[in-house]
Amino acid sequence: MRIGIDARFFGPVGKGLGRYVERLVENLEKLDSQNEYIIFLRKENWDYYTPKVSNFKKVLADYPWYSLKEQIMMPIVIGREKLDLVHFPHFNIPIFCPKKFVATIHDLILLQFPTPRATTLGPLFYKIKYFGYRIVIGLGLRRAKKIITVSECTKKELVKFFKINPEKVEVTYEACDGVEYGQLKMPEKKHLAKFGITKPYLLYVGNAYPHKNLEGFLKIFSKLNLDCQLVLVGREDYFYKRMKEDIRGKTLERDVIFTDFVSEAILADLYRNARLYIFPSFVEGFGLPGLEAMSYGLPLAASDSSCLPEIYGDAAIYFDPRNEEEMIEKIKFVWTDELTRQNLIKLGLERVKRYSWENLAVKTLQIYQNVGKN
């Protein structure tokens, strides 16, 4: 078969989605020497990927995500490459794709948590974007030969929202990068001073979109009455800037640290030195940073909503993200109770072993082969 992968999100430019595409391609290169693969990239990530084997080739498809140009030009490029199958790793599926395709849907956050606060667009344009999203994803999912989700929770939501046959949907769990499980390096504190970290700290890694509930967490942070700091790791964008403005001049400002984007080495040190990882989201598709925290031996306090209990199992303490008192109680408990902390660390290091990028690639390849036969 000649298989195309829309890898325009490949690498750091695509954040979590970029990592998914990157790890999928890396592992398919190791697993499959029979099929030919065409990896579609944009100029901004063109140099980030170099095929390591002869049956993989990269092709430029420099069309912006979620654009009209993408809808028009991607079908032309796909047709030109004479593909048997295409994998779209996100919901921005060209609705006139001329070939059989599978699609990965990581979450349905725009449907589950619609809010104009999640965009810099005005209310009217947000509504247009919302309805455009529903049309594109609805048409794409109906035409897809198979749909991949990264959790059973997202699969159930997909079936419910779009009335899709559950047999059409396969789950392939993601995995975390990082340290060798059970072989944790000693933490280094050389990077902490540069950010003004002077106390034990709670850690969060990711964006600050409204569904992440960071604004809600900031409301209860000072009520924890713990002599600690809150370290928020994520590229400074409109949403993080808005949070900074919201706390400017308030007492908690001195104990909330925004690191902006950091390198992998610095991020590893921030994980290793933290006392607790917090994940207060209202809704998620997988919750990868929580697994990363576990892999570094960091206890986790997480929301009990959406997919998080499915992914973390008994290796986390859970709270209702809409209940301030419960959030405070659970976070203080895992912060102070050493027996619980050590148990969570042990369970977390075991939990991450369930998830593997190789397993994801194996199952994805099986999906390609099954679709190709039919």
Show where each model-derived region lies.
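Carbohydrate transferase catalytic cores enriched for Leloir-type hexosyltransferases
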Residues: 1-374
